[in-house]
Structures are given as C-alpha cells and as structure tokens.
Amino acid sequence: MAETFTEQLTKKVAEADEAEANEQTGNAIKLYEQVIKEAAKEPEDLTEDAIKAKEVATYKLANIYKEKGLVNELIDLQKSILPLFIDFPKSKTAKIMRSLFDLTLKLDGHEQ
C-alpha cells in the first residue's frame, strides 16, 4: 500500500530530525525544504497532520538558519512559504510569520 501524503511528510520530517541530530545540517536543510515545498496532489490530502508537518519543518529550518546566522536564507524562507498560507488557517499563518519575523530580528547580522 502506498504511503499517504501525510505519511510521506511526517517520514521526511523524522529523517531531517535524525540528520540534524547527527550534525548533517545540509541534509536536514534539504529534507525540511522538501517537506515545505511538497504540494498535495488533491485538496483532501492536506490534512491537519500534513499542515502540522509543514509547520514543524518551517520552524526547524528557520531555527537552523538562525543558529548558523544565515540571515538571507531566513528572509528567503519567509518569502518562499507564502504559497503555503493559501491552505493554512489564518491564525496559524499569523503565528508562523510572527515567529519567523522575530527570529530574523534576533540575528546578529540583521541590519535594522
């Protein structure tokens, strides 16, 4: 039986977590990016758990960028996730954007 969209996303997040724990940051970044960019084939594929997996991947990727001081990548992440928000509840969208904005402001290399 084929994996569902949600199972695929959840599996990739787990793989990325493992890569990050093993200090394979480059691999973790790629996997988190794949989760964020992966589009649902059908609207019903975008379950609450699939949205949660994308949200978790976004936060974890943002934290990697913050830890590494990658200001431009963090700003680009904010721009690249905008298409996701079509499917997200407005409250979740606001929370994610506020969190990413706050992370960006906390970076040392960010000019205000």
Regions found by a protein language model. Name each.
Residues 1-112:
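Extended alpha-helical scaffold regions
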